[in-house]
UniProtKB/Swiss-Prot annotation:
Xref: HAMAP family: LeuC_type1
Function according to Swiss-Prot or TrEMBL: Catalyzes the isomerization between 2-isopropylmalate and 3-isopropylmalate, via the formation of 2-isopropylmaleate.
PROSITE patterns (alphabetical): ACONITASE_1, ACONITASE_2
Protein's name in the database: 3-isopropylmalate dehydratase large subunit
Organism taxonomic ancestry: Bacteria, Pseudomonadati, Pseudomonadota, Gammaproteobacteria, Vibrionales
Amino acid sequence: MSNAKTLYEKIYDAHVAVAAEGENPILYIDRHLVHEVTSPQAFDGLREKGRKVRQVGKTFATMDHNVSTQTKDINASGEMARIQMETLSKNCEEFGVTLYDLNHKYQGIVHVMGPELGITLPGMTIVCGDSHTATHGAFGSLAFGIGTSEVEHVLATQTLKQARAKTMKIDVKGKVAEGITAKDIVLAIIGKTTAAGGTGYVVEFCGEAITDLTMEGRMTVCNMAIELGAKAGLIAPDQTTFDYIAGRKFSPQDADLDAAIEYWSSLKTDDDAEFDAVVTLDASEIKPQVTWGTNPGQVIAVDAPIPAPESFADPVEKASAEKALAYMGLEAGKSLSDYNVDKVFVGSCTNSRIEDMRAAAAIAKGRKVASHVQALIVPGSEQVKAQAEKEGLDVIFKEAGFEWRLPGCSMCLAMNNDRLGPHERCASTSNRNFEGRQGRDGRTHLVSPAMAAAAAIAGHFVDIRTITEQA
């Protein structure tokens, strides 16, 4: 039997602390990221049992989910939000955990902050009480979301019981066409696998189209691994990864970095390793993507007609499509460009990094947001905001009629003041288009930052390729 291993298996095996017969192994956890929503009860549990945080140096907290993007006033998003943020401050102070609070220069969305500070490194196990922790897998780390009781367990022990997952390889062969982004790639993947196709698996994304991506693009892809049902998504580290890491606040320096890179270079799937499942896509066939339904797998190319429920052979998919079309207020056979958008949101842990800001600004420059559209640009962190302002992107956005906001999760989820009203239609760069995700009865269409900016200007969805050809 071959000893060849996948990248996931290498990282998993390296972190097994205890493997008792008949039980799931206990894994050591290298980094624990904490935010205000899923941590209060976990800290309460420590307090009740008289426990400390086992490794404060490996635990980092920030405020992101329910912060206001219009003011640094802790009261702005309502009483529950204020309580959660104040509680996080008290808990971090009491237990000695590093906190990047509302007024800190490193505050931001947890999955933007971790990578940009060098907290996230290849080969690590990383957890957070948040669904989209898979983002960090872009660095070749095993990163996944956990529940609040597990947050307490990791705070107390720096370990977690974790069953071995099945492995899936998603191979995006060849190069994408001009103007096709990481968001289009991952939406096309989910369109093929469906929103449940990765259930029970840890996915490794491979292929030329993936290795061609920048680190920010790779984070977008891994961020949405959970949206095809996977436990986590990984991309093997390479020179692109090492160049991104070098010089960041918590990254290894000098000789330590050289030694780390030597180890990180071994973090790749062995040539003869076998995956439990393989999915292949032709990158050249991927077009700009827009979701039409109420899960990320209900997605089409921007120039394709809205599908008819009867086009689905599976009765469950057919029923789901009927329900989604009714909720979204769409008619099969029509084009998504036939429908006006009311709001546009560029942000979230999927697409709020500096390259996302630049992509949206390139479309916004010299143009104007349609009069009936409210368009928000929400940088993912204070660091992203500062860099964007240094480059003058905020001025481009404001002159075009976009709102330039403060960092936070914002309109990705209805936990702060940025939300949709009933039946409002939104072009959003976030990761979930579930019913009510952005506000009760709100209608969410997931797109790339460039596609979102273009929709803001046209007032409806347009094929980004027609705009870039004119530019």
